[in-house]
């Protein structure tokens, strides 16, 4: 039931098949050699999960698509959701919820169709819209993140420059 109520894909994954998720977290994610690369740890964990499900291409399309979507969701969470409050936060939460279900559905279709030919035929029939949208959102997210970081650096530079000017002004007096 928690899968339906949570707002994000990441939360949904945590509530999906909790016993298996716990085993994967303890035995793969936490034991991954490099703690520095979160996407690598997540990818290795989901690769193990895909292997456990079997050797059908659909399992890999579905399960290995998740780390890319989670990193996209994390980026947009930092950009728009984290600091939002009130009705704006509610609207953003609803959008995240809709996108979560779109991602689950889009990736889940690959799991169900199973063979590469069926998956390719279906994704082609919808013009690979999920992957195209995700790539566009990732690109836009990178641009906005870089702009935000550049604005923060300018703000810090001005603040540091303003402090230096104030110190020099006091010395002159």
Regions found by a protein language model. Name each.
Residues 1-173:
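Non-catalytic, membrane-anchoring transmembrane segments at the edges
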């Amino acid at each position: 039931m928690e899968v339906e109520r949570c707002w994000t894909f990441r939360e949904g994954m945590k509530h999906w098949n909790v016993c298996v998720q716990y085993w994967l977290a303890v035995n793969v994610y936490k034991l991954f050699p490099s703690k520095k690369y979160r996407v690598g740890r997540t990818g290795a964990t989901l690769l193990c999960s895909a292997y456990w499900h079997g050797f059908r291409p659909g399992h890999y399309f579905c399960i290995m698509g998740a780390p890319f979507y989670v990193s996209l969701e994390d980026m947009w969470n930092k950009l728009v959701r984290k600091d939002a409050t009130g009705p704006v936060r509610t609207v953003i939460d609803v959008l995240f919820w809709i996108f979560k279900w779109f991602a689950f559905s889009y990736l889940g279709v690959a799991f169900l169709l199973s063979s590469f030919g069926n998956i390719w035929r279906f994704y082609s029939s919808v013009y690979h819209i999920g992957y195209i949208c995700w790539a566009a959102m990732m690109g836009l997210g990178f641009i906005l993140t870089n702009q935000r970081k550049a604005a923060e650096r300018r703000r810090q530079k001005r603040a540091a420059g303003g402090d230096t000017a104030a110190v020099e002004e006091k010395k002159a007096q």
